[in-house]
């Protein structure tokens, strides 16, 4: 069903009308057409970039009418996209996406680097606890090359992990096996900052306060 809109090249639509228009277009993607007099415009919502694209539908090829239709489309497109053209919306989306990917890659590299620097050869005889407390929560075996990881971001309790197993989780973007949180470099603990709490029977982070 077409939408009839009283709109000219210099018009500024109230925000409530823009919100209504956005909603209608988002709900009717197939054949939404905006008509004012003899000008018809197709409007589409592109969910992938969260933006609207508007194109005039030219029923004739008179140059002056085509230019006016293009001007109306550009004006309305900027208003419905909060001051940006659809091209700008797409460009901003791609820029933000590349920044996010770069940030995520940097965070992942920092996490891997910290695991490498905090990993150590596990000698069960060096620990005062029973060997069962040295088993990795992923492999259920005592690791040859291990690293201490907090049980959750805010926990003071940590566990010994097999270095290769925890690295595999990170490469596959799997969550922390105990807390189900995203694994972060703040969870990686130096061996010298952990001790076995005999009373509570688990490894604990040394208080530095």
UniProtKB/Swiss-Prot annotation:
Belongs to the NleG E3 ligase family. It is found in: Secreted; Host cytoplasm. Gene3D superfamilies: Effector protein NleG. GO terms for biological process: biological process involved in symbiotic interaction. It catalyses: S-ubiquitinyl-[E2 ubiquitin-conjugating enzyme]-L-cysteine + [acceptor protein]-L-lysine = [E2 ubiquitin-conjugating enzyme]-L-cysteine + N(6)-ubiquitinyl-[acceptor protein]-L-lysine. This is Probable E3 ubiquitin-protein ligase NleG7. Effector proteins function to alter host cell physiology and promote bacterial survival in host tissues. This protein is probably an E3 ubiquitin-protein ligase that interferes with the host's ubiquitination pathway and targets host proteins for proteasomal degradation. Mice infected with a strain of bacteria deleted for this gene were colonized less quickly by bacteria. It comes from Citrobacter rodentium. Its EC number is 2.3.2.27. Two sizes of protein are detected in situ; only the smaller protein is secreted. The lineage of its organism: Bacteria, Pseudomonadati, Pseudomonadota, Gammaproteobacteria, Enterobacterales. Disruption phenotype: Significant reduction in bacterial colonization in C3H/HeJ mice. Keywords: Host cytoplasm, Secreted, Transferase, Ubl conjugation pathway, Virulence. It holds the Pfam family T3SS_NleG.
């Amino acid at each position: 069903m077409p939408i009839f809109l009283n709109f000219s090249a210099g018009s500024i639509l109230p925000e409530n009308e823009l919100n209504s228009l956005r909603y209608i277009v988002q709900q009717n993607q197939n054949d939404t057409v905006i008509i004012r007099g003899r000008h018809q415009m197709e409007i589409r919502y592109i969910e992938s970039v969260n933006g609207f694209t508007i194109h005039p539908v030219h029923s004739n090829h008179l140059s002056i009418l085509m230019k006016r239709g293009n001007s109306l489309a550009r004006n309305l497109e900027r208003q419905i996209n909060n001051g940006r053209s659809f091209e700008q919306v797409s460009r901003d989306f791609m820029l933000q996406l590349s920044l996010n990917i770069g940030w995520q890659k940097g965070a992942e590299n920092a996490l891997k680097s910290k695991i490498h620097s905090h990993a150590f050869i596990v000698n069960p005889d060096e620990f005062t606890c029973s060997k069962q407390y040295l088993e990795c929560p992923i492999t259920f075996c005592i690791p040859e090359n291990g690293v201490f990881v907090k049980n959750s971001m805010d926990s003071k309790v940590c566990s010994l992990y097999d270095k290769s197993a925890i690295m595999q989780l990170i490469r596959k973007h799997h969550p922390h096996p105990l807390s189900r949180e995203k694994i972060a470099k703040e969870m990686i603990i130096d061996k010298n900052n952990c001790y076995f709490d005999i009373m509570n029977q688990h490894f604990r982070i040394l208080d530095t306060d």
